[in-house]
Amino acid sequence: MKLNQDSLTSKFGSPIERVEQAIKSVQQGNGVLLLDDESRENEGDLIYSVDHLTSEQMALMIRSCSGIVCLCLTEDKADYLELSPMVEHNESVNQTAFTISIEAKKGVTTGVSATDRVTTIKTACKNGALPHELAKPGHVFPLRAKDGGVLTRRGHTEGTVDLMRLAELTPAGVLCEVTNSDGSMAKTPEIIIFAEQHHLPVLTVNDIALYRKEKSN
C-alpha cells in the first residue's frame, strides 16, 4: 500500500510538533527538510538559517542535493539589495520568484565553492548589507518570498522565511532541493530516509500554515 505524505511524516509527530522540532533545529544551527504539498511540486528541500550557515552545511547541499542553492529573502530585503527579477515575464508553473543571481565582491575566488557561496550569503544578509557589495550574476540564486508567507503562497520559499521568523532568526534562509543518487528528484519516502540518515526533522509547508493559524487564534 502506498502511503501518503501525512502518513509518512506522522513518525515525526503532529503538525504542530513537527514545526516546533524544526524551530528548535534551526535555532541550534541545524537543518530541516521541508516538503511542499503532494499536489504541488511534491519535493523536499534541505533548509538552513543564514545566521548559522556553515561551509560544511553548504557542502552537503552541493554534494547531496541539486546543487542549485537558493537564498530566500523577504520582498523588502530583495528590494533593498536591488535584486531585480531574473526575467521580466515569469512563466514558471509555480511562479518561483528568482532574482538575478549574486556573488560577493570581496572574500571569494571563483564564487562556486561551498565556502565562497557561504561568504556571498553572509554578505547579502549581514546587518547593513549594501547593493554595491554584490556582483551580478553569480553562483547564489536569491528567491523573493511573498508577503504573507505560506498563507499567501504555499512554496518552499515562503515556508523557509516563515520558519526563520517563527524561530526569531533573521528572516532569510538557504534551500536546495534533495535529489536521489540517480539524479531524479527525491519524493517523500526518499526525503524521510535522507532525514533519518542526517538526523534532521521533517515538516511540511502545510504544517507551517496550520501552526501560524493556530498561534494567531
Curated annotation (Swiss-Prot):
Keyword annotations from UniProtKB, A to Z: Lyase, Magnesium, Manganese, Metal-binding, Riboflavin biosynthesis
Binding positions (Mg(2+) 1): 41
SUPFAM superfamilies: YrdC/RibB (SSF55821)
Recorded GO CC terms: cytosol
Cofactor binding annotation: Binds 2 divalent metal cations per subunit. Magnesium or manganese.
GO molecular function: 3,4-dihydroxy-2-butanone-4-phosphate synthase activity; magnesium ion binding; manganese ion binding
Keyword DNA damage among UniProt keywords: no
Summary of the function given for this chain in its UniProt record: Catalyzes the conversion of D-ribulose 5-phosphate to formate and 3,4-dihydroxy-2-butanone 4-phosphate.
Similarity field: Belongs to the DHBP synthase family.
Protein name: 3,4-dihydroxy-2-butanone 4-phosphate synthase
Natural source organism: Aliivibrio fischeri (Vibrio fischeri)
Lineage: Bacteria, Pseudomonadati, Pseudomonadota, Gammaproteobacteria, Vibrionales
Name of the gene: ribB
